[in-house]
Amino acid sequence: MTQYFEIENRDGAARIGKLLLFPEIRTPCALHTAALGDLENPGPIVDAGSLWIADQKELEARIKEIREKTGKGTLIILPHQTYPPAVPAESTGKVEAFTATGDENAEAEGPTGSLLRAEGEVRKSDLYIMEGAGTLENNARRFLETLIDLKNRIPPDTALYAPKLALPENAAMLAYVGIDVMDDTRAEIAAYSDIYLTAAGSFYLDSLVEFPCRCRVCAATTPAELRALPKADRVELLSAHNRDALDAELALVREKIRTGNLREYVEGQCRVRPWLTALLRLGDFEYSYIEEKVPAFRQSQLLADTSEALSRIEVVRFARRIQERYAPPDLDVLLLLPCAARKPYSTSQSHQKFILALGKYRKFVHEVIITSPLGIVPRELELTYPAAHYDTAVTGHWDEEEKAWVSGCLESYLSKHMYKAVVAHVEGAYREICERVAEKLGIDVVYTAGESLASYESLTNLKNTVEAICTSKDFSRKSQNAEKEKKNFIKAVAGYQFGEGAGHLFSEEVGDPLVKGRFPKYQLFAGKKQLATLIPQYGMLALSPEGAELVLKSEKYVVKIDDFVPRGSILAPGVLDAGPEIRPNDEVIVLGKKALCVGRAMMSGREMKESGRGVAVDVRHVKKL
């Protein structure tokens, strides 16, 4: 925990924060490396020096001098002795000896930064520096392993600094995986080598005909004019451009974090260098590290335009919850349908035609939509994020990765849930997927589509096929009326959202709950008590205190506080415990000795327990106990 860093916005592992120094520093940011060593005119962050070039006593005196001059408004990076990551930990004892004698006094007087190596001891600090970060460029696996090791061991509300690594081309990816602070070392070095930096990559100055930038340097000169300048003047101007390009990229990254679509940006930006693409893909494989930080829903649309969208956390989480938490209605006929451009699907023109064709037999049918990248979407979850909030490039062509992923989702579902009859009103790749799964599982699927899904012939065939199944002698005629359909809708959303805790909303204790309202503005009642409301914007439930008391029995999505009655948002220091399953934007139940509250989580459960600053829960209702 630190009192000098406050997180303001989150987008997965990326975040916008403030280093509470003088002046404040907004992160993610790039420090001016040359200014870190300016002891005469120290800025908000000062490097006390290296143990390679000065002894311990000299550096301790330097720390004291800096602190007396700047007060607590300056963060002092404690003396360090940097080693390449390959050097064994037992060979780095000298830096341990320094922090053991100098750390306590420095910490008591003001903010400090400490060097941290993989698997090394974590000491209390306000900024952690990733040792040897610059040597890990082009080694995505080693970089990510080191980063995750450090992130899992330091407090979640503390900033992490990766020195000597940032360029305009990789700054977005570094922020995406969780780096808060960078520097302009590489930008300065590039200038001395006549290298011109952009977010789209680097260029040698002698290869440029015109500048693809309109910064203060580029707008005032041309590549030919810059090449004609003396070396010192050329370096000065090129360095200014490179630093501006890095700062501009980080400003864009901060905006992407605010709007919640940094992922879409890095899916394109990572193409600049192969190691960045590898870093994105490896990050998706580290599901638990990233998933903990990804919100339950976003305000922005999810754009699935690349192959990496199939492994995106929101997509994988949705698919997993379908398999692990979703319970379909008790019906014997499954109807597989293709997705639609308009969301939710049931409002699209094509799905309206399917529904009209089913007519009175729709109540016997369970509808599941096949789609990429989400895999399958039961009709009851078509409103739930991200099912109604994604868009993808539609070409009519599915690559093998898409087919394999969606086939796997459908196969897992049909292996777990049995139907007496399966009808598929699909064509093209959708039909190929159904045929693959049917052959593998040994089930019969009836296909009803002709040349066009929405043609009169196809719709008539769909109607007649379903009618024939539902009127056959051996058909059990399990069905759901309008009221039961609405109840199944709410039950599915609750199960997706709360897991096993959702069952308490429909337990015998509640009796026979009633769903009121028209789609999508459903409300769940037990008698005259409102238990929950479906929020159409993201397709999840907002609990009332009465509903919270029921879900509370599962002991999931619970935040525990001390004996006080909240009067607004609950801050992280006020949290005693929080469920590890809690993600940002989750609906949570706050329980204390004097109050029961419901609200929205503003950070993960782990962050709530381990953070010293920031809003943990945005409280909506408070019930005094």
Swiss-Prot record:
Reply yes or no: does the keyword Nucleotide-binding apply.
no
Which GO molecular function terms does the record list? lyase activity; RNA binding
Question: GO annotations under biological process?
Answer: tRNA wobble guanine modification
Keywords associated with the record? Lyase, tRNA processing
Q: Does the keyword Lyase apply?
A: yes
Q: Offer a single GO CC term for the protein.
A: cytoplasm
| E.C. designation(s) | 4.3.3.-
Reactions performed catalytically: 7-cyano-7-carbaguanosine(15) in tRNA + L-lysine = 7-N-[(5S)-5-amino-5-carboxypentyl]formamidino-7-deazaguanosine(15) in tRNA
> Which EC class does it fall in?
lyase
The pathway where this protein functions is: tRNA modification; archaeosine-tRNA biosynthesis
Entries under InterPro entries matching the protein: Archaeosine_synthase_1 (IPR053418), ArchSynthase1/Queuine_TRR (IPR050076), DUF5591 (IPR040777), PUA (IPR002478), PUA-like_sf (IPR015947), PUA_sf (IPR036974), TGT-like_sf (IPR036511), TGT_C2 (IPR029402)
Q: Matching CDD domains, A to Z?
A: PUA_archaeosine_TGT
Instruction: Identify the domain of life.
Output: Archaea
- Chain ranges of the PUA domain: 556-624
Q: Which SUPFAM superfamilies match?
A: Pre-PUA domain, PUA domain-like, tRNA-guanine transglycosylase, Uracil-DNA glycosylase-like
Q: Which Pfam families match?
A: DUF5591 (PF17884), PUA (PF01472), TGT (PF01702), TGT_C2 (PF14810)
Role according to the record: Functions in the biosynthesis of archaeosine, a modified nucleoside present in the dihydrouridine loop (D-loop) of archaeal tRNAs. Catalyzes the addition of L-lysine to the cyano group of 7-cyano-7-deazaguanine (preQ0)-modified tRNAs at position 15, to generate q0kN15-tRNA, a q0N lysine adduct identified as 7-N-[(5S)-5-amino-5-carboxypentyl]formamidino-7-deazaguanosine.
Q: Assembly and interactions?
A: Forms a robust complex with the archaeosine synthase beta subunit RaSEA. Formation of this complex highly increases lysine transfer activity. The complex likely consists of an alpha(2)beta(2) heterotetrameric structure.
Regarding protein family, the annotation reads:
Belongs to the archaeosine synthase type 1 family.
Descriptive protein name: Archaeosine synthase subunit alpha
**Whose protein is this, by species?**
Methanosarcina acetivorans (strain ATCC 35395 / DSM 2834 / JCM 12185 / C2A)
